[in-house]
Amino acid sequence: MDIVLLVKAAVMGIVEGLTEFLPISSTGHLILAGSLLGFDDDKAKVFDIAIQTGAIFAVILVYWQKIHSTVVALPRQAKARRLALNVVIGFLPAVVLGLLFGKMIKAHLFIPVVVASTFIIGGFIILWAEKRPPGSVRIEHVDDMTMWDALKVGLVQCFAMIPGTSRSGSTIIGGMLLGLSRQAATDFSFFLAIPTLIGAGAYSLYKERALLSVADIPLFSVGLVFSFISAWLCVRWLLKYISTHDFIPFAWYRIAFGIVVLATAWTGTVVWAE
């Protein structure tokens, strides 16, 4: 296989890993990187599933101890059952809305003005969320969330169907605005990512199954490995970062990136569409 193509796969994997779990929208960055690298044909849709899988493996590894202890404790601990149920409840709204409106959103909202607007608006929402008064935090730990809290975060996650919004951004910042601490919102966002990304990937794999080829295994493997490594490093870094910092730098980054989207679309440098 062409070494240049493998290098492109590695770059795309790194972009996915670094952006999937930060509140900056992996979709927008993958579109930009794919367009600049010439890695944006139909096969790229299947490749996106591979690199997303690498990111899923990374977050599972980082949270493995918590996931394992929760699963083992399900028969005897109400706290474990509540967390598992909350993840399921938070996951369901995206499933329903995705099946009902997924095609329509991809057909009508994947345009530069929408992508740029969601980047910029999302940036200002982060700035607003970080200005919360100290007493607005109701929930310090993810285990203390109620089913109602989980449902509300799950509903907020549905906004991530709009390109440029960011799944992690919507759930983390949405959770904070709903009264979760920065740590609790981030933890629940990562737990929620596991079924959400697995479900979306499985559905996309089924839809694009005609594009699968054994010859592409090396390409997909490279992307998956680099996505896994970069996502693992990114998640570990973010968990340390939020213990002493806020999300304001990401807000300004989003606003700047939204301007980049408009500029590249206006000049024709990047084709912001599927």
UniProtKB/Swiss-Prot annotation:
Listed disulfide bonds for this chain?
Answer: none
The EC number of this protein is 3.6.1.27
Q: Name one GO cellular component term.
A: plasma membrane
Question: Where, per UniProt, does this protein localize?
Answer: Cell inner membrane
A single GO BP term for this record reads: regulation of cell shape
* GO MF term set: undecaprenyl-diphosphatase activity
| Predominant place of localization | membrane
Record protein name field:
Undecaprenyl-diphosphatase
Q: What is the lineage of its organism?
A: Bacteria, Pseudomonadati, Pseudomonadota, Betaproteobacteria, Burkholderiales
